[in-house]
Amino acid sequence: KPGLVENHKDLNALVKEIDPTRLTTMAHVSMVPLDSRLHGITDLESYNHYFGWYGGKYTDNEKWLDNFHEKHPEICLGLSEYGAEGIITYQPDEPKCRDYSESYQAEYHEHMAEILMARPYLWSTHVWNMFDFGCAARNEGGTAGRNNKGLVTLDRKIKKEAFYLYKAYWSREPFVHMCGRRYAQRPGDADR
């Protein structure tokens, strides 16, 4: 049996044989090293990165992307997954990583949108995910059976703060959105 790298090479060759005009791509997870033999097999590559959610800080994203691009300028690099969970009822005074708050999710995506737009060498970026979704094995943030990384709630009724950030970047439709409206009970003086 061929190993993982040989398998990917065989699959890539098969795609090229079937349709030589079709671009091929591969998604890697964060732990695939920069010197992996998996690099360069396909025409395009992407990484699933969650710096600032599962580990590290969200500022680690730009460091990693720039380091990869410096070491492999010949590879068309994309970001196939990135995101942070945001539960609309979680509204802390000071959002922080893995607090599952809507406000941290918005802060994370504000940073990501800025750094991704500043890197024209990225061939693609994919927010994970448009909607919260069911996932039987999950039990995080006090909500069993659900992944809360969506920009919109599971029932498709409530657009989270981060949704409006991307709407502002990606839509030509004029709109006004007031951030923080679900953060109504704030600590401190009422006139602050």
Predicted regions and their residues:
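Extended substrate-binding grooves/exosites of carbohydrate-active enzymes
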Residues: 1-192
